[in-house]
Amino acid sequence: MSETIERHEFGAEVGRLLDLVVHALYSDREIFLRELVANAADAMDRRRFEALTSAASALPPDAKVRIAPDKEARTLTVSDAGIGMTKEDLATNLGTIARSGTRAFSQTLESAKAEDRPSLIGQFGVGFYSAFMVADRVTVTSRRAGSDEAWTWASEGQGSYTLEPATRAEPGTDIVLHLKADADEYLEPYRLDHLVRKWADFITVPIAVVRDGKDESANQGTALWRKAKSEVTEEQYEEFYHSIGMNFDKPWATLHWRAEGQLEFSALLFIPGSKPFQALENERQSKVRLHVRRMFITDEAELLPPWLRFVQGVVDTEDLPLNVSREMLQSTPALARIRRAVTGRVVSELTTRAKDAEGYQSFWENFGPVLKEGIYEDFERRGEIAPLLRFRSSAVEGWTSLPDYVSRMKDGQEAIYYLVADDAEALKSSPQLEGFRARGLEVLLLSDHVDAFWPDQLGTFDGKPLRSITKGGLDLSKFALEGEQPEAPEGIDAFVAAVKTALGAEVSDVRTTDRLVDSAVVLSAGSGGPDLQMQRLMRRAGRAGAGQPVLEINPRHPLIRALAAAPESEVPQAAGTLLDLARIQDGDSPRDPAAFARTVAAALAAARGA
């Protein structure tokens, strides 16, 4: 060994640590380039800052981060014109793992979830060592700005490194990776281009990838969200929107602002103009990208709640460390404040745009079911979300809102009535609506998959309770029906009791009702439990506690009047048929379809005198 080459040992645990970095992160090893580029960009920012007080540190006009693959030599070189390092800096900065949390890093990396491991290497200050995931030897040649000396640090990742004098024409750093046999992809300029766009597209430092001996720009270099709104054109907004989410439409809304004060961040968010191809029902996590100092960190920071997961875009802050695990992100107070602020801004935008009924309609038809989830997921914002909801109605065409419904309530009406079913078209002809329509009472018609859940969570709106009309205990007697109504037949009480006996445990009760006009029977739920739609969902899921429905009978219907006067021996078969009719009206099948078909056929034959 030359006398000018110094050999240093990392420390007893470093061999194990490097082994962990290389093997535990193998599937995510592309992040090595993110780490090296982030370090290079930071070095150039530091030099730019130092130049404010030292002319000797001024950056050259063409300063950039340069990524140069060499297929013949099988090397990848990342160069920068940054602040550079002295011999002592190299020993300290690239040797810190010997004395700064090696054991803690090793233990944390071993116990961390696979998806959190990539960010841990930066969190513990060992991001540089991710280079050994793709290289079996790494050399770093650096010259500190303001110094004439350059030094080369070299290691094979086996627990030791060397330092020796070197030459470098200008201040800055060259990191040369001697690539492993299975790392050929990082010799391809197109692959390097892709990684730069993925991880560092918007950092302000220019990044070039060398292709056929020429430097080609690989990043935009301008963070659009960092610009003032007045400096950005609609075309630029659209181009960025298309690039971040593979969108081909125009955004329905663009939100661009900068928060300043105790918490500082920039945000550029988009609400799409159409539903995405992938189902929002299957993917419930927000994918807004988190950047720290323009460097992409993750799109899994859950910057927005699941009920706003249709929003796309970027939030960039300097109030978070550049590298932090997702697990630690969730408990970071600064991130919690960012989430609250960003969520509030999106809700405020929706509130403003909801005043334009026609414009808001397209948003609602695309993302309404997702927004409804906020009612039962976000107690704090429930009151802000409720006025944004839109519904079909038994009384008006098109969409209506809860405030509009309340403004149309009849004198003496105390509740907001709604009906939930799977089929929007079936709702309009549901017998559940007959008594309400006949009395001029409006009912909201709900058919989204979330509608069985949120009304009970909201409870009230503007002091008015929300009531499912399929629940028992609704008293409509204060609202008179138009026209003269026939009296209930004699013997109706005995008939109802006989039907209840005949059906037994298949129903929880049988009773007369004033909610029907044209139909003979209808199902309802008990007043204290879940409504019919929730009971139906519980049965489909095999959950206990769904209970049995109540069979309500219209005593003024011709069929019921006739059955009430029929011999008692006919009640058991009639009771089963009435229950099947009610089930069919409610969107369910008869208990025994074949038996029901025979009953109907026999009744038709009898009616024809056959």
UniProtKB/Swiss-Prot annotation:
Highest taxon in the source lineage: Bacteria
Coiled-coil annotated spans: none
Gene3D superfamilies xrefs: 3.30.230.80, 3.40.50.11260, Heat shock protein 90, C-terminal domain, Histidine kinase-like ATPase, C-terminal domain
Job description of the protein: Molecular chaperone. Has ATPase activity.
Spans annotated as C: 537-610
Chain positions covered by the region annotation A: 1-326
InterPro entries: HATPase_C_sf, Heat_shock_protein_90_CS, HSP90_C, Hsp90_fam, Hsp90_N, Ribosomal_Su5_D2-typ_SF
Organism this protein belongs to: Methylobacterium radiotolerans (strain ATCC 27329 / DSM 1819 / JCM 2831 / NBRC 15690 / NCIMB 10815 / 0-1)
Organism lineage string: Bacteria, Pseudomonadati, Pseudomonadota, Alphaproteobacteria, Hyphomicrobiales
Record-given protein name: Chaperone protein HtpG
Keywords from the named record: ATP-binding, Chaperone, Cytoplasm, Nucleotide-binding, Stress response
Subcellular location: Cytoplasm
Keyword Nucleotide-binding recorded: yes
Any one of the GO CC terms: cytoplasm
